[in-house]
Amino acid sequence: YLIAAAGIVLCLVIPIIIRKVRFLSEWRILYGIVGIVSLAVVVVVGRVSYGAMLGFTVAGINIQPSELVKIVFVFFVASSFKRSTEFKDLVVTTVVAAFHVLILVVSKDLGAALIIFVVYLVMLYVATHQPLYILAGLGAGSLGAVAAYHLFTHVKTRVNVWRDPFGTYDNGGYQVAQSLFAIGTGGWFG
């Protein structure tokens, strides 16, 4: 309960601090470096868990830097777009964002990579109002999804389970099938 209480307090206090502290937008380079270094540490010293390198252990405490990086990444992109939305600056920000995603893909943390990618696309659109950037991003994301399907067996397994949860009931489809049973029995609202 102590951790939950601390989390609630942080959720209430941090927005107030962010509104009061204007200099946070000047640390974009620090945000980019912290994000990339945090993810790179996992690639170097991380332990493999269920096929992915998600974190490491220090003094018996499991640390998963990708959770912190999701927040730091938002600060990085926001401060970069506040500084400039000229095309050359967008390219630099996109390269740094792509490096974040690439490190996550190398460590097989595809869920975090997808979150970072989608967050970047949404923030890019909000900052520039250019639908072409969204279309290009969706095209690149589609190519990445096809590549992930062919490169990672666990992605292929998940797609097959999604396509036929009852055919793969004993080999990965159990949870999907049970959720379909629950929806069929109780509907969306139980």
Regions found by a protein language model. Give the residues of each.
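Oxyanion-binding "anion nests"
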Residues: 175-190
